[in-house]
């Protein structure tokens, strides 16, 4: 990890992913968690304020970068939310099989290198009746927008810490062995369309 990725990028992402339209998206999904909850890619803690309105039990925040947790821990204290930090990758979650009620992932599936492996891990750690709650940006349905996503993706990925603009989120979740209880999608307002097509909902293991 270079200096940019270690010290600069986390704060850029904290600002970008904390915009009002994205914050409204977070507010839609985070309160739906319940029981033992594992947040994948807790990052700088942008979801933390919304746990107060949920039925969360034990809360675990997983992230590969301890630098993010330095920011997230401040947010945690400000909101009086108890969260255990776990430094690990989404592709290899150090949690036993069938041990969590909810897996929450927001604006993170775009970045995980081996996303198929990570989704298998989500499925592995969930209890039999557990749920995957997600809110992600991804491939747009409009051909012209998708073309721009494909063109911009290489440089975007390099500058934004591995973020991909053009992943098909519903397809990835479905192919990973989940079925949707709820799936919504739209361009979020006040956001460039190439980065602003959102998918969010709830899925359960097939």
Write out the residue ranges for each language-model feature.
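A short SAM/SAH-binding and catalytic strip from SAM-dependent methyltransferases
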Residues: 101-115
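A short acidic, Gly/Pro-enriched loop at the edge of an enzyme's catalytic core
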Residues: 88-103
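Core SAM-dependent methyltransferase catalytic element
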Residues: 178, 185-206
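Conserved alpha-helix/loop element of class I SAM-dependent methyltransferases that forms part
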Residues: 16-36, 46-50
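Conserved beta-strand signature within the Rossmann-like core of class I S-adenosyl-L-methionine
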Residues: 129-137
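A short glycine-rich, Lys/Arg-flanked "PGG" loop and its adjoining helix->strand segment in the class I
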Residues: 116-128
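Class I SAM-dependent methyltransferase SAM/SAH-binding core
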Residues: 38-92
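Short alpha-helix
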Residues: 161-177
């Amino acid at each position: 990890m270079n200096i940019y990725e270690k010290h600069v990028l986390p704060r850029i992402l904290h600002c970008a992913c904390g915009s009002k339209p994205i914050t409204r998206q977070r507010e839609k999904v985070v309160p739906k968690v319940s029981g033992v909850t594992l947040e994948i890619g807790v990052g700088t803690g942008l979801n933390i304020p919304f746990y107060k309105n949920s039925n969360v039990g034990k809360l675990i925040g997983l992230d590969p970068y301890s630098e993010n947790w330095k920011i997230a821990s401040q947010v945690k204290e400000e909101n009086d939310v108890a969260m255990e930090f776990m430094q690990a990758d989404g592709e290899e979650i150090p949690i036993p099989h069938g041990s969590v009620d909810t897996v929450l992932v927001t604006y993170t599936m775009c970045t995980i290198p081996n996303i198929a492996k990570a989704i298998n891990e989500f499925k592995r750690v969930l209890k039999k009746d557990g749920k995957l709650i997600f809110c992600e940006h991804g491939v747009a349905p409009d051909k012209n927008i998708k073309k721009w996503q494909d063109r911009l993706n290489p440089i975007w990925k390099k500058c934004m810490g591995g973020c991909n603009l053009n992943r098909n989120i519903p397809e990835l979740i479905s192919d990973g062995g989940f079925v949707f209880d709820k799936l919504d999608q739209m361009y979020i307002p006040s956001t460039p369309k190439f980065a602003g097509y959102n998918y969010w909902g709830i899925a359960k293991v097939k």
